[in-house]
Amino acid sequence: MPITTTRQQDTALFVAAFFDEMVRWGVCEVVVSPGSRSTALAMAAYELEQRRPQDLRVYVDIDERGAAFLGLGLAKASGRPVALVCTSGTALANYYPAVIEAETSRVPLIVLSGDRPPQLQGLGAPQTTDQLKAYGNHVRSFRAMPTPRGRDRDIAFARQAAREAVLAAVSYTHLRAHETSQDL
């Protein structure tokens, strides 16, 4: 009998694989600006830090602009990509000055933003901003992550996306992940 999972479990497995792969490829620090849409991302980072504190350090800053510049400073100091995690809506916009600075200074940053599911885009739902090309030409790559469905290929995709993000973050990358709670 096949094992069934919930959307939250599918998302948790997806983002856990994503963070595990980022760490494997050299990301040692994550700065989280907590918010409801990025809960799965924040929890995956925190849980990985708890399991492997020698491999990952997670910082929390409720001010998105300050968090982004903290991440920028950490990346400048280490020369390694730092991941920034924020929720949807205008939180993403508050990272913009640091993203521009990262591009100008050639500092490796990876922005991971939570988002509403695609079916709520463009309908006036709160905390919904068109994230496609939100940073314009200031990032090397943008990828909208699919909604995980609990398939093995979802995990493979998460790992591939993480590798590509780290490799592209020789400067700057932005990935958007959909929040998948039952109470949309």
Spans of features found by a protein language model:
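Hydrophobic or amphipathic alpha-helical targeting/insertion segments
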Residues: I100-P118, H138
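Short acidic, glycine/serine/threonine-rich loops at helix termini
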Residues: L41-A45, L72, Y95-P97, Q121-A125
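Conserved thiamine diphosphate
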Residues: R80, T128-Y172
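Active-site-proximal loop->helix
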Residues: G73, P117-A134
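Thiamine diphosphate
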Residues: P2-S88
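Conserved small/polar residues in nucleotide/adenosyl-binding loops
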Residues: T173-T180
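Hydrophobic/aromatic ligand-binding patch that stacks against planar heteroaromatic rings
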Residues: L70-L74, A98-E101, A134-Y135, A168
